[in-house]
């Protein structure tokens, strides 16, 4: 089967049964993200055995990694949407060229961020409020991660390219391989393992970072071999055919940059909240970090559905199949909502057991459980915001995601938290209340924007001249 026929066949399969198509894309993503989430949970359990300061040191790194993740995933979403629309238009040449531009962008971003991290990382951690042993532990972790950052960024872009053509299984299998390897290497690099003959390296938090970097190098190597040597994908990479185009760069950036900036805003917000929470104690920051890891588990299926929506919406929009487009949007968002209702119920009743996996410190457990039980009431609203944003990205609209993030995070939650804590002298629960209010604001903006956008779409597929 030639590549054009393959493209048409995949699009037709998706159109024949959009709901089945959604899950055929989402389940492999869910599997891969599930393994990654398992790693994040296990990693935190291992680091938790090093003490509360180790958890807090890693917590101060999270805004920086959220920034890197934001740029990679945000621009990656632009890549996915661009490739999906070109495939929907049956334009393989431009789909290939879009993928090649993505690789070009990965080179620039990875080298820039890695260099900045190595030169200014410790200073940035200090600006976030880390000091003393916490600053030392945070920098131990960060400087190792910066060395491996290019491999992580490239792998993220490769996944986005494959997602654009509807291939979710292979990238998630590769990510799963890296995660399993990471879980195996973590205890070897972190602990001395005296009970097992002392063959562990005992490198502490730096060891956790080394285990991650090694696994990401292997993931990157597998992607390069399969995409450039074995030519596994529908997309083909040929340097001689590469034609630099500002139109393609703009097509990616107009969707991806607002998404990236939205995650940058979230990273800044997380840094602000770390600084607010350290006002109470290092244990409060540690509790927030643990609760955040459990959050990831709650939203695992939601991010999977959302990623699938970007691909399907992009393809259906490019093919002008508006009835299928509307059905897919409605079905995907409602599926995410009901899944989150179930997971929220579970979290509310079993939050103490979940947090107890990470630490036996009663104060940390108490703070984290309070956070989770409060947020169980707004998780379903967050799921609608996440899926709505990815739908709008699939339609080629990146700005809404940025607005949906900036207004609640910098305009609502952070100012409210600062006011309640530093001016009103309220307890830490008022930080959580501030976040919950911002969640309701984000939900309202997202839903309003989506409804108004859908109303502008034609009611039937537009006829084109043959």
Cite the ranges covered by each PLM segment.
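Helix-terminus/linker motif at the lipid-water interface of multi-pass membrane proteins
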Residues: 34, 38-56, 125-132, 188-203, ...
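Hydrophobic transmembrane alpha-helices of multi-pass small-molecule transporters
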Residues: 67-70, 182-186, 220-224, 297-300, ...
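Small-residue hotspots at the loop-to-helix junctions and early N-terminal turns
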Residues: 52-63, 138, 142, 282-297, ...
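Transmembrane helical elements of multi-pass membrane transporters/channels
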Residues: 24-40, 144, 155, 178, ...
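Short alpha-helical transmembrane segments in multi-pass integral membrane proteins
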Residues: 1-26, 83-150, 198-257, 313-378, ...
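Short runs within selected transmembrane alpha-helices of multi-pass transporters and secretion channels
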Residues: 76, 145-163, 171-179, 208-221, ...
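Small-residue-rich hydrophobic transmembrane alpha-helices
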Residues: 55-115, 152-171, 288-351, 382-404
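Signature of the first transmembrane helix
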Residues: 20-80, 84, 257-277
């Amino acid at each position: 089967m030639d590549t054009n026929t393959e493209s048409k066949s995949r699009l037709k399969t998706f159109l024949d049964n959009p709901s089945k198509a959604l899950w055929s894309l989402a389940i492999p993503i869910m599997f891969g993200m599930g393994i990654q989430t398992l790693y994040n949970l296990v990693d935190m359990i291992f680091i938790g055995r090093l003490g509360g300061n180790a958890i807090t040191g890693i917590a101060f790194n999270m805004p920086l990694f959220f920034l890197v993740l934001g740029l990679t995933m945000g621009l990656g979403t632009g890549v996915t949407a661009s490739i999906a629309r070109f495939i929907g238009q049956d334009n393989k040449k431009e789909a290939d060229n879009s993928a090649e531009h993505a690789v070009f962008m990965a080179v620039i971003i990875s080298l820039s961020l890695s260099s900045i991290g190595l030169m200014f990382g410790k200073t940035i951690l200090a600006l976030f409020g880390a000091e003393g042993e916490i600053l030392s532990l945070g920098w131990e972790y960060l400087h190792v991660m910066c060395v491996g950052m290019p491999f992580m960024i490239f792998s993220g872009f490769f996944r986005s390219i494959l997602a654009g053509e509807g291939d979710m299984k292979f990238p998630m299998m590769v990510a799963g391989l890296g995660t399993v390897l990471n879980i195996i290497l973590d205890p070897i690099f972190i602990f001395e393992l005296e009970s097992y003959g002392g063959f562990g390296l005992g490198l502490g938090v730096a060891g956790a970072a080394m285990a991650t970097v090694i696994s990401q190098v292997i993931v990157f190597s597998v992607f390069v071999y399969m995409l450039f040597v074995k030519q596994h994908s529908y997309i083909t990479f040929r340097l001689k055919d590469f034609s630099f185009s500002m139109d393609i760069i703009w097509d990616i950036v107009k969707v991806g940059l607002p998404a990236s900036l939205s995650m940058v805003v979230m990273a800044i917000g997380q840094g602000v909240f770390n600084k607010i929470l350290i006002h109470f104690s290092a244990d409060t920051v540690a509790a927030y970090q643990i609760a955040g890891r459990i959050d990831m588990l709650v939203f695992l299926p939601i991010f999977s559905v959302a990623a699938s929506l970007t691909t399907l919406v992009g393809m259906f929009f490019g093919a002008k199949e508006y009835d299928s487009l509307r059905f897919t949007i409605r079905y995907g968002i409602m599926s995410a909502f009901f899944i989150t209702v179930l997971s929220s119920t579970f979290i509310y009743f079993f939050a103490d057991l979940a947090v107890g996996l990470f630490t036996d410190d009663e104060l940390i457990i108490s703070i984290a459980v309070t956070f989770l039980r409060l947020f169980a009431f707004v998780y379903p609203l967050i799921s609608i915001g996440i899926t709505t944003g990815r739908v709008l990205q699939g339609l080629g609209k990146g700005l809404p995601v940025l607005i949906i993030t900036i207004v609640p995070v910098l305009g609502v939650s952070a100012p409210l938290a600062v006011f309640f804590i530093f001016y009103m002298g309220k307890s830490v629960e008022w930080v959580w209340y501030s976040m919950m209010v911002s969640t309701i604001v984000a939900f309202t903006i997202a839903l309003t924007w989506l409804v108004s956008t859908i109303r502008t779409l034609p009611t039937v597929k537009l006829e084109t001249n043959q």
